[in-house]
């Protein structure tokens, strides 16, 4: 038996142990957020914030005034006004929805119900709509 074949199982076992011990170290090195999340969150806050409301209001007012008082507009200018009008409405859509009091989607509410015998609480889904009454 040569020295090369004698040490191969030992090196294989050591390599497997080393790879198994690296798994936790490699998994725990992540910061939890991806590098593009921060710029996307800033863009989202800019689009849905108060600045977007003012931009949407100005775009709707200017495009509407151009369509009403613009007189004879060529096809390109009219389409540009329509694009500005639709963009203003889309940017102001969150403010329009918030105007009616809607804050977000709520499909079902989970409430915790405590058992009278002192067992741990279990979540209970409150059903609403047609299927709620049987």
Curated annotation (Swiss-Prot):
UniProt-annotated location(s): Cell membrane
A Pfam cross-reference name: TrbC
Keyword Signal belongs to the record: no
Entry keyword set: Cell membrane, Conjugation, Membrane, Plasmid, Transmembrane, Transmembrane helix
Coiled coil: none
Membrane topology: Multi-pass membrane protein
Entries under InterPro entries matching the protein: TrbC/VirB2 (IPR007039)
Predominant location category: membrane
Transmembrane segments: 10-30, 51-71, 80-100
Superkingdom of the organism of origin: Bacteria
Gene Ontology annotations for the cellular component aspect, listed alphabetically: plasma membrane
Family membership noted in the UniProt record: Belongs to the TrbC family.
Record-given protein name: Conjugal transfer protein TrbC
Naturally occurring in which organism (per UniProt): Rhizobium radiobacter
């Amino acid at each position: 038996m040569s020295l090369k074949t004698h040490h191969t199982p030992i090196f294989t076992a050591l390599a497997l142990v080393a790879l198994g011990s690296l798994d936790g170290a490699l998994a725990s090195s992540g910061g939890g957020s991806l590098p593009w999340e921060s710029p996307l969150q800033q863009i989202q806050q800019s689009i849905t914030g108060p600045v977007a409301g003012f931009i949407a209001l100005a775009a709707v007012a200017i495009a509407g005034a151009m369509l009403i008082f613009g007189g004879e507009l060529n096809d390109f200018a009219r389409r540009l006004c329509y694009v500005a009008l639709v963009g203003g409405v889309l940017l102001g859509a969150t403010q329009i929805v918030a105007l009616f009091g809607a804050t977000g989607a709520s499909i079902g509410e989970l409430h915790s119900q405590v058992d009278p015998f002192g067992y741990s609480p279990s979540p209970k889904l409150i059903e609403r709509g047609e299927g709620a009454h049987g």
